[in-house]
Amino acid sequence: MKMRLFLFLFFFCISLAEAQKMPSNRSSVYFTYGNTGANLREFNQMLDQKGLSPMRKAYRNFGFGYQTRYNDFVLGLELFQNNGPKSLFNGYELDYRTTRVYLNVGYSFTEEGRFQLIHYMSLGSGFMNFQMLRGNPKKTLDGFLQNPAHGFILRDGDIHKGSQHFAGFLTEIGFQLSYDIEIPGREEMVQVISKFGYSFSPFEDSWLMKDIAFGNAQSGPFLRFGAGITLPDHNFFYKDASLGLHLSYGLHFTEPDVLNAALVENGYRPFEGRPNNLGLKLLGESKGLLYGIDFYNLGLSGAATESSNHTLNSVRVYLNGGLKFFERRNLELGGLAGLGYANLRYTLTSTDKPDFPALFEEPDRDGHLKARGLMGKPELYVAYGIPLTNKNLFSMIVSLHGGYELPLGNYSLGGVGMSSYMANPYLQLSLGLRP
C-alpha cells in the first residue's frame, strides 16, 4: 500500500512538471544536522514511579537528502539517522536510535534562483532500537557465546535483518530555506540549507514494545542546518552534467564461515545463505568525471536456539569517484573507486523477554558484539537511460554494477577476525531517476 502511494505521488509530480510550458529544473544533494524535541512519556512515567530521573527530551538528527525541482514542484528523498541521549542507571547505559527514510513532495514559493523557500510533506517508514546495556566483560567470542546476556535490546522495523524490514508509517511537514553560493571556476554551486517543521508518528499503537509506546522517539518539532551541491539548469548544459539517485539491490558472494564455526561449537545454529542488500546510490557526472555516494545495509538473521534469535548486520557508506569510459545514445559504461566506512554487529536476543517494568528490573537478556573500520572497492557499471517525458525532462536509469569490496582492517568480533566475510565480490542492480 505504501509503495503504491509513493508511485502515485511520483508520477503525479511528473505529469505536473510535463504540463508546464517552459520547464526549469535543478538537482541537489545535501547533508543536514539538527535536533528534534521528544519526550518518551510512558517510559519516563515508569522511571518517575521508581524515583528515577527521566531521560532528556531531545534527539539528534543526521540526514542525507536528494532533491529535484521542476518549475515550482519538488520531489525528493531523505535518509535520517537519529540518536537519542544516553543515560546511566545502575551501571547500565540506556539509549535509543532510529532510522527513517522519507519520500518528499513539495512546492516552491519562490521563482527559480539563488534563494528558495519550499514547503514540503514527507511520507516514510522507520526503524527503532531501544537498549539498556552494561559493558560486556567477555573479551572473547567463545566467552560471549557462553554467557551473552548483558542487558536488553528492543527493535521494531528491524533493519538488522535487512532494509526490507523497515516498518511503521511516518510523516513530516516542514519548510526549507536555501541559498546558492558560487564556486569559482565551476558551474556547480554550494547550497546552504535550513529546515524546520514537525515529524509525526500518526498512529498511537505504533512503536509499541513490551507494553510501552515509543512513538514519541519518531516525532517532534525539528530544526536542521546543512549544506550540499546543487546543479541549476541555467548553469549547465545537461549533456555535461547530471545528478541522479538510484535504489539498488545487491548480492554479496560471501558467508560468515568463521563465525558459523564458533556458533556451532557453542551450541547455536549457524547463519544460512549469503547476505543481500537494499540501498541508495547517488551518482553524479561533471564533464566526464563521476562522483557519488553509496549507502547500503547487509543483513543475515535466523533462529539461534529454541529461545533466541540472532542477526549479523553491516552498514556501509562509500564516497566514490571515477570516469565514464563510453557513452552512445542512452547507453553508458563507467568505472568507480570507492573509500568508505563499515560496521559489523552480531546480536543475540532472547525471544521470551517480559514486559516493562519487569524487563527494566531484570534486564540481562540480550547481548551484542560490534566492530568497525574502513573499506575500499573498485567498481564497473553499465547503465541504460529511458526518457520518461516528451520534453526529456528526466530519464529512468537501469544499471548493473559489479565490484569487489576490500576491508582495510581485521573487523574483530571477540578476537575473531571477520575480514574474510567483509571481503567479497558483489553485483548490484539499480533503478534510478536522473534529469
Kindly give the residue locations of the regions a language model identified.
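Bacterial Sec-dependent N-terminal signal peptides
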Residues: 1-27, 115, 227-233, 331, ...
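Short glycine/proline- and aromatic-enriched beta-strand/turn motifs that initiate or cap beta-hairpins
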Residues: 20-71, 207-213, 220-287
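Residues that define the transmembrane beta-barrel architecture of outer-membrane proteins
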Residues: 25-27, 56-62, 95-101, 115, ...
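Transmembrane beta-strands of outer-membrane beta-barrel pores
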Residues: 33-39, 70-72, 79-85, 123-129, ...
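Extracellular loop and loop/strand-boundary signature of outer-membrane beta-barrel proteins
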Residues: 47-52, 87-94, 157-164, 206-215, ...
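Residues on the lipid-exposed face of transmembrane beta-strands in outer-membrane beta-barrel proteins
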Residues: 64-68, 103-107, 121-125, 171-181, ...
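Gram-negative (and chloroplast) outer-membrane scaffold detector with strong preference
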Residues: 71-154, 165-171, 287-359, 366-381
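Predominantly the C-terminal beta-signal and adjacent terminal strand-loop region
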Residues: 176-247, 381-435
